Amino acid sequence: MSTELSVIESRIRNAGELANVDEELVELIVKPIRVLEMSLILRHDDGRHSLFSAWRAHHSDVLAVDGMKGGFRISPDVNRDETVALSAGMTLKTALVGLPLGGAKGGICADPKTLTSREVDRLVRLYARELNPH
């Protein structure tokens, strides 16, 4: 488990304890309800193919009435734990401002600086197609 993820889980547990929230409810909030892991095969402009790892984390829908909120990023540093940690952060942000939304976040592990704009477009579309049934 990454440092970011362990820190945010620890903070949620501490806040739950301070607020005297039932431990079972705290655990429902701590863990993501769904993490989708994808392998995206991109066809480059020159005909080569590359494999990219990608994730989408739906953190918590305990307070959600209207679905999930959260974007995605493309970076060579993206990984599963970071994606889950960022989705947890989004859950907390929406709760703090009173939005009836759970937190979500997504990411593609790729360096967009090494891709053409058409390749980035294709990669994002591949990602979106993989998410469509979910």
Describe the predicted segments one by one.
Residues M1-H134:
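N-terminal ligand-binding/catalytic initiation module
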